[in-house]
Amino acid sequence: MTFSFNLSDELKSTLLVLAKKDKPLADAINKKIRQIIDSDAIDHYKNLRHDLNNYKRVHIRKSFVLLFKVNKKDNHILFDRFGHHDDIYT
């Protein structure tokens, strides 16, 4: 099942900066986004808890995390934030 998706403004600006400074990381993020929207097992991705309980997360490389929200009713994913795992949850 393929999901429709949007990128938050924050994530768009992060990707623009990374495309210039760290192209392999930007490519890894784009590859992971394509993998997620084409995934049949969207529940495979870890749900977060507490204040971020409506988000799921996926690791990119070892130290970075991409947060996203899934709306199964509308078959839509909002990719919201990307950052280092020490900073992303604040």
Indicate residue ranges for each PLM-predicted region.
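Basic, amphipathic "hinge/linker" alpha-helix immediately C-terminal to the N-terminal HTH DNA-binding motif
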Residues: 7-11
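Alpha-helix boundary recognition
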Residues: 20, 30, 37-38
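Enriched for short, Lys/Arg-rich terminal
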Residues: 2-4, 16-26, 42, 60-90
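Nucleotide phosphate-binding site architecture
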Residues: 12, 49, 89
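A short, surface-exposed loop/turn module that caps and links secondary-structure elements
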Residues: 34-58
